[in-house]
């Protein structure tokens, strides 16, 4: 048997982190077992489904490196098949036409609530002859659900779960306008796509009992179900905007690498030893459902940022530089030309050691494209007082005399200057850093000066010396 999983989002908004994790788990499970991972867009809600949301799903999955093994299936294109199955159930006596009016259904609900019973359809038309209905009256098609016994699901994560059939009502398969309901369409699609394992959030668990009834009414084998615990905020409440990023788009814009997000989401609810950083190959090799817990997971943004920093330090410098240049586009006071790009690329080994997100990395690298005169932070301005400017004037002359403006030559020059004037190396490096960046942080000063280039370094020193004060 070929293992076949699917990710089936509704295109009604952004790709939420919970759905992204479900997609990742389905993808890894299929790859681990040498199976297939499929994508289905459940777009039957025409009022809420948009092409923009479809594109967001496709872009998000591609960014995460999650690739389907076949062209995506659009649920709306399969409506004829959904209708065909419902009519087959009708012909087999496993479904029936219900002619109840909206008013009758409302009265039914109100009566149940008044009697403190769950508001369920009471089966008024379950055994009645359709000929009793007024000619041309609208109807829905309902499943004739079993009323005795239990429906049992052997869930691969939650264990054995069961519900008394008496607690379930006869769910609608086709609405009065002939369109299929979500629960019915999903069963038809999963069966026809030969899905062997359905992995989704445990908020779908109650739906599974109803869907199992459709499978059994059609005489179809049920897939294996695995309902994954939800992701909560750090405080244990439902994840919301007040906690921070929620969607893949949010995390991407906030500067997280896809490798880091996938790595984090995998370990959020799945455990395997103490390994913190796992490559995609390792994820595929190790992932299986026996490591998935039942309890909700809590989003830890601090841990994610830490993990992102690890992945950034391992990332290719060209790739990081390209991302930084995109983020700096249009920023006031920053030139984003080839010269700036070359400077950032040269400094990237030092820049990426300090940053935990690409946003932070871009902020730290922006000085490479600053236009003169620079604006200085209060701490930087303090370093550029009388003593600092004296250092700049003196060391500037020695830097101007260098024929090879390499990190090694610069380091030797700064050390020699400090030794000659009997001051600490930091007393030389700190004013230089302030003059170059407008702040007090940068990669190593030798790497920073070399990357900026001799002409730019001397120009920035001159700009400080020419002003009455740093921010004049």
Swiss-Prot record:
ATP binds at residue 241. A motif ('HIGH' region) lies at residues 9-19. Gene3D superfamilies: 1.10.10.350, HUPs. The keyword Aminoacyl-tRNA synthetase applies. One of its GO terms (molecular function) is zinc ion binding. It catalyses: tRNA(Glu) + L-glutamate + ATP = L-glutamyl-tRNA(Glu) + AMP + diphosphate. Signal peptide: none annotated. Keywords: Aminoacyl-tRNA synthetase, ATP-binding, Cytoplasm, Ligase, Nucleotide-binding, Protein biosynthesis. This is Glutamate--tRNA ligase 1. Its main location: cytoplasm. Disulfide bonds: none annotated. Belongs to the class-I aminoacyl-tRNA synthetase family. Glutamate--tRNA ligase type 1 subfamily. InterPro entries: aa-tRNA-synth_I_cd-bd (IPR045462), aa-tRNA-synth_I_codon-bd_sub2 (IPR020751), aa-tRNA-synth_I_CS (IPR001412), aa_tRNA-synth_I_cd-bd_sf (IPR008925), Glu-tRNA-ligase_bac/mito (IPR004527), Glu/Gln-tRNA-synth (IPR000924), Glu/Gln-tRNA-synth_Ib_cat-dom (IPR020058), GluQ/Sye (IPR049940). It comes from Gluconobacter oxydans (strain 621H). GO terms for biological process: glutamyl-tRNA aminoacylation. It comes from the Bacteria. Residues 112-133 are annotated as: Disordered. Residues 112-131 have a biased composition (Basic and acidic residues). A motif ('KMSKS' region) lies at residues 238-242. Monomer. GO terms for cellular component: cytosol. Catalyzes the attachment of glutamate to tRNA(Glu) in a two-step reaction: glutamate is first activated by ATP to form Glu-AMP and then transferred to the acceptor end of tRNA(Glu). It is found in: Cytoplasm.
């Amino acid at each position: 048997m070929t293992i076949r999983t699917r990710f089936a989002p509704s295109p009604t908004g952004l790709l939420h982190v919970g759905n992204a994790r479900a997609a990742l788990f389905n993808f890894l499970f299929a790859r681990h077992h040498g199976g297939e991972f499929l994508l289905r867009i459940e777009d039957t809600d025409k009022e809420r489904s948009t092409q923009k949301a479809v594109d967001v799903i496709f872009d998000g999955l591609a960014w995460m490196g999650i690739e389907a093994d076949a062209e995506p299936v659009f649920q709306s294109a399969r409506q004829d098949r959904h209708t065909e199955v419902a009519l087959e159930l009708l012909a087999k006596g496993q479904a029936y036409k219900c002619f109840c009016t909206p008013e009758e259904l409302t009265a039914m609900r109100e009566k149940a609530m008044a009697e403190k019973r769950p508001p369920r359809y009471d089966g008024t038309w379950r055994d009645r002859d359709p000929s009793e209905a007024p000619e041309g009256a609208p109807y829905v098609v309902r499943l004739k659900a079993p009323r005795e016994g239990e429906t049992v699901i052997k869930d691969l994560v939650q264990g054995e779960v069961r519900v008394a059939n008496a607690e379930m009502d006869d769910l609608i398969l086709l609405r009065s306008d002939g369109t299929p309901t979500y629960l019915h369409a999903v069963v038809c699609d999963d069966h026809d796509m030969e899905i062997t394992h359905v992995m989704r959030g445990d908020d779908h668990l109650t739906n599974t009992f109803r869907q199992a009834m459709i499978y059994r009414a059609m005489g179809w084998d049920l897939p294996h179900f695995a309902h994954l615990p939800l992701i909560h905020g750090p405080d244990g409440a439902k994840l919301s905007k007040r906690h921070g990023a929620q969607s893949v788009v949010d995390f991407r814009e906030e500067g997280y690498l896809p490798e880091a997000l996938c790595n984090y989401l995998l370990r959020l609810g799945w455990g395997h030893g103490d390994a913190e950083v796992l490559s995609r190959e390792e994820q595929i090799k190790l992932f299986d459902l026996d490591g998935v817990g039942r309890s909700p997971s809590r989003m830890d943004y601090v841990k994610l940022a830490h993990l992102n920093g690890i992945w950034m330090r391992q990332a290719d410098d060209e790739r990081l530089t390209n991302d930084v240049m995109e983020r700096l586009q249009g920023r006031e006071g920053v030139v984003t030309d080839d010269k700036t790009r070359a400077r950032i690329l040269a400094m990237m080994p030092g820049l990426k050691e300090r940053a935990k997100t690409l946003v932070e990395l871009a902020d730290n690298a922006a000085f490479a494209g600053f236009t003169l005169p620079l604006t200085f932070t209060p701490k930087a301005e303090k370093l550029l007082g009388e003593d600092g400017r004296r250092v700049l004037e003196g060391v500037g002359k020695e830097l101007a005399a260098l024929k090879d403006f390499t990190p090694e030559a610069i380091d030797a020059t700064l050390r020699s200057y400090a030794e000659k004037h009997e001051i600490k190396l930091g007393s030389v490096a700190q004013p230089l850093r302030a003059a170059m960046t407008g702040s007090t942080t940068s990669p190593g000063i030798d790497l920073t000066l070399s990357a900026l280039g001799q002409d730019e370094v001397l120009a920035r020193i001159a700009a400080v010396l020419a002003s009455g004060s740093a921010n004049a």
